[in-house]
Amino acid sequence: MKFFLLFLVVLPIMGVLGKKNGYAVDSKGKAPECFLSNYCNNECTKVHYADKGYCCLLSCYCFGLNDDKKVLEISDTTKKYCDFTIIN
């Protein structure tokens, strides 16, 4: 019974924390190109419904995308670089 109650408490939290980061792609499989972070923030939040976005390596990198959104496959090094850059 305790396990079941714990499961009911943890399940909604996992849904909230289940967001991902990456280059969101359109229907053609292309990530938006950019030079300015403000453009990417608008693109990510209004078009892809992410929490925020910025320009990383000339493409819009979005934070807080829903799990059902498609993202561009990138190397772990690029992902770590873009994740690290926004923190600092």
UniProtKB/Swiss-Prot annotation:
InterPro entries referenced in this protein's UniProt entry, alphabetically: LCN-type_CS_alpha_beta_dom, Scorpion_toxin-like, Scorpion_toxin-like_sf, Scorpion_toxinL/defensin
**Could you state one GO biological process linked to this protein?**
defense response
Q: In which tissues is it expressed?
A: Expressed by the venom gland.
| PROSITE patterns in UniProt | LCN_CSAB (PS51863)
Q: Tell me the SMART domains matching this sequence.
A: Knot1
Q: List the disulfide bonds.
A: C34-C55, C40-C60, C44-C62, C56-C82
Under Gene Ontology molecular function, one entry of this record is: sodium channel inhibitor activity
Provide an example Pfam family for this protein.
Toxin_3
Q: Which part of the chain is the LCN-type CS-alpha/beta domain?
A: 20-83
What compartments host this protein? Secreted
Any one Gene Ontology cellular component term annotated for this protein: extracellular region
Swiss-Prot/TrEMBL keywords: Disulfide bond, Ion channel impairing toxin, Neurotoxin, Secreted, Signal, Toxin, Voltage-gated sodium channel impairing toxin
Protein function: Excitatory insect toxins induce a spastic paralysis. They bind voltage-independently at site-4 of sodium channels (Nav) and shift the voltage of activation toward more negative potentials thereby affecting sodium channel activation and promoting spontaneous and repetitive firing.
Family label: Belongs to the long (4 C-C) scorpion toxin superfamily. Sodium channel inhibitor family. Beta subfamily.
Principal subcellular localisation of the protein: secreted
Anything noted about its domains?
Has the structural arrangement of an alpha-helix connected to antiparallel beta-sheets by disulfide bonds (CS-alpha/beta).
Query: Which range is the signal sequence, renumbered to this chain?
Result: 1-18
Q: What is this protein called?
A: Beta-insect excitatory toxin LqhIT1b
